[in-house]
Regions:
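Active-site microenvironment for binding and transforming phosphate-containing groups
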Residues: 1-129
């Protein structure tokens, strides 16, 4: 799934985990979310993701200072980790590529980093038993 700042703000990670866990309960039981491995792919990093006061305040209110620090920058990956933890996914099962799409624009596309004109990324996930 894709979770830009609006998706993170709207708890898309929690909703996705709960939806999958509901579907997996018959197979994995009530603790299904604790068995999930999560990969956080390339994204705008906190050093490059500067926001206005309104968005910053929303993130502080939602997730605390851990992901909305210094008054203007937001750490989207930390917001996602907080959400996943709340949904029952163990932090030890979350892998963050930690590649900033703005800083590494020769490797990745970035809407913000490229002034609104950019390409697209693709990813897929496979469940194995």
């Amino acid at each position: 799934m894709h979770a830009g700042w609006r998706g993170v703000d709207n708890l898309i990670s929690v909703k996705a985990v709960r939806s999958m866990a509901y579907a997996d309960e018959t197979l994995l039981g009530a603790k299904a979310a604790s068995t999930y491995n999560v990969y956080i792919g390339p994204h705008i990093g906190p050093e490059c993701f500067e926001t206005g006061a309104d968005v910053h305040a929303r993130f502080v209110s939602q997730f605390g200072e851990a992901c909305a620090f210094d008054g203007s920058h937001i750490d989207l990956a930390e917001g996602i980790r907080i959400q996943l933890d709340q949904a029952g996914v163990s932090r030890s099962r979350i892998c963050d590529l930690a590649k900033c799409t703005v800083c590494e624009n020769s490797e990745f596309f970035s809407y913000r980093g490229q002034g609104g004109t950019c390409g697209r990324h693709g990813a897929f996930a496979v469940r194995t038993r």
